[in-house]
Amino acid sequence: MRGTRSGGVDVFGNRDASGNVCGGDRGSVVREGATLAVGRDVDAPPEATARALRDTRRWPDWSPSVGGVESADRYVETGTTGRVRVAGAWVPFRVTSATRLRWDWEVAGIPATGHRVERYAGEPDRCRAVIEVPLVAAPYAPVCRRALDRFAALVEGE
């Protein structure tokens, strides 16, 4: 499904033209300015979901592209540094900004994905996990969808 939200934002996946999530596989890819927002509903409270997303020890459990992580910080904060193993090579990372429900990072000095958790009004045990991909890295969006499916299964299984 593809449509356009007001403001000229392209919508892919299963969000309707007003940007609301529809049925289906509960995943979507939405263009937001210079990024693609790859999202998936998670049947877990937003705080627990965000904590799992910020947990460096769990990244290899759900991210197909992360084979390992080394960091002094278990939960990312602004300024967290370390290295991740990607395609067999260790590369440095730095978290450029972090809040309770959002964080962004650079990998090998290059701005990479953003990560956020969105709340649903009136639904304390459900939220949406989103990975933001720069448009120049659009081919990475399917990897992010797979990552979010694995992430949701991990968080919902707790």
Describe these PLM feature segments:
Residues R2-D73:
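Hydrophobic ligand-binding cavity/cleft-lining segments
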Residues G33-G39, T81, W90, R102, ...:
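Intrinsic-disorder/low-complexity, polar/charged segments enriched in Ser/Thr/Lys/Arg/Asp/Glu/Gln
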Residues T35-A37, A89-P92, P111-V117:
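Short, surface-exposed coil-to-beta transition loops
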Residues T49-L53, W59, G82, V95, ...:
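Hydrophobic pocket/interface hotspot
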Residues Y75-R83, A98-W105:
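Short, hydrophobic/aromatic-rich segments at coil-to-beta transitions
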Residues A87-V91, S97-R102, I110:
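Short, charged/polar surface micro-motifs in flexible loops or helix N-caps
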Residues R102-E158:
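Beta-strand/loop substructures that line and gate deep hydrophobic ligand-binding cavities in soluble
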